[in-house]
């Protein structure tokens, strides 16, 4: 009789990526205790499963005091044109005053004004909260309610201070054996 490890339960059907899955398991366990995760930056070449890994991670974040998955929002950053659009079309309707895990895929495409705003939003402090003002609105960010995950193939295009505010998780390129296993699963 085969036993299933905790990592296999948390990341079913994800082949390889042992180190990344181990780190993410640690953060899932920490989230269970504190309702917070560090801001994460998944970095890997195309086709290494950044989005799939982030989605699997997100499915394992449970709202504290409830037995349901924390809501998830994923956007492709190529759709973000400027800070005003980001605030009006993403922050206001989807993130403000919400319990949510927010994944920004292809984050190297985030415009500079949005990256600069994220520097303020993600600035670490003991209260685990920040306020970002834009126009007439104040966005009060509580990291016990909102979790940020970024994914990129081109980390060198990200502002260094923004990278410094994130826990970097590098995914490995798949071996031929792992690619064969992935094909068999699909």
Regions found by a protein language model. Give the residues of each.
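Pre-Walker A (pre-P-loop) alpha-helix and adjacent loop at the N terminus of AAA/AAA+ ATPase modules
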Residues: 3-43
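Short glycine-/polar-rich loops that comprise or flank the Walker A/P-loop
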Residues: 7-9, 37-38, 67-72, 98-100, ...
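Short glycine-rich substrate-engagement loop in P-loop NTPases that contacts/grips substrate
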Residues: 21-22, 68-99
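Conserved catalytic/switch belt of AAA+ P-loop NTPases
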Residues: 29, 92, 112-145
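Walker A/P-loop
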Residues: 29-75, 91-93
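Conserved nucleotide-binding/hydrolysis micro-motifs of P-loop NTPases
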Residues: 46-48, 78-82, 108-111, 148, ...
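Conserved AAA+/SF3 P-loop NTPase catalytic/coupling segment centered on the Walker-B
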Residues: 82-86, 96-125, 155-164
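Conserved AAA+ ATPase core "coupling" helix
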Residues: 87, 157-186
């Amino acid at each position: 009789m085969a036993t299933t490890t905790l990592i296999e339960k948390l990341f079913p059907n994800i082949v390889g990526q042992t180190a990344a899955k181990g780190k993410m398991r640690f953060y899932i366990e920490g989230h269970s205790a504190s309702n917070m995760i560090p801001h994460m930056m998944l970095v890997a070449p195309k086709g290494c499963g950044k989005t799939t890994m982030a989605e699997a991670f997100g499915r394992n974040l449970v709202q504290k005091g409830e037995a349901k998955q924390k809501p998830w929002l994923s956007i492709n950053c190529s759709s973000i044109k400027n800070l005003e659009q980001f605030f009006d079309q993403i922050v206001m309707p989807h993130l403000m005053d919400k319990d949510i895990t927010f994944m920004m895929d292809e984050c190297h495409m985030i415009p500079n004004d949005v990256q600069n705003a994220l520097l303020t939003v993600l600035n670490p402090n003991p209260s685990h909260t920040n306020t970002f003002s834009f126009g007439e609105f104040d966005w009060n960010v509580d990291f016990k309610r909102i979790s940020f995950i970024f994914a990129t193939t081109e980390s060198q295009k990200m502002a260094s201070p923004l990278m410094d505010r994130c826990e970097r998780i590098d995914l490995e390129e798949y071996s031929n054996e792992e690619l064969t296993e992935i094909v068999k699963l699909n």
